[in-house]
Amino acid sequence: MRFMPLFLFAFAALFLPGVAARAAMPAPYTITLKNGKFTPANLSLPANKKIKLTVRNEDAMPAEFESSDLDREQVVAAHDDIIVYLGPLQSGVYNYFDDFNRKITGKITVK
């Protein structure tokens, strides 16, 4: 019985930091470039949250994920992924495109 407080303290010391770390982690989302288009074409994200955005390029050519609205510009090699951290973002629409082929566009709607 006298070891119960020690056990509870040890349990809390091991368990609670993991809970706090998971709560602080950015929410994961993915945009995929395949067959010359982004999917989804319009990604909905929550406002005022940190976001971990994976940009996956399934095409055979490299692409450049670019957005002046988001102030991001990053090359994605063929058949590769990049991670882009965003936010917290305010409500609105944020456009992006492939700078190597500007006809390939998408948008992020934040609500």
Go through each PLM region and give its residues.
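C-terminal segment of classical bacterial N-terminal signal peptides
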Residues: 13-21
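N-terminal edge beta-strand
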Residues: 25-48
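Residue-level recognition of conserved beta-strand positions in structured domain cores
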Residues: 33, 55, 67-69, 86, ...
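Beta-strand cores of secreted/periplasmic/IMS beta-sandwich domains, seen most often
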Residues: 41-59, 81-89, 95-97
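Histidine- and aromatic-enriched segments that form or immediately flank copper-ligand environments
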Residues: 60-78, 106
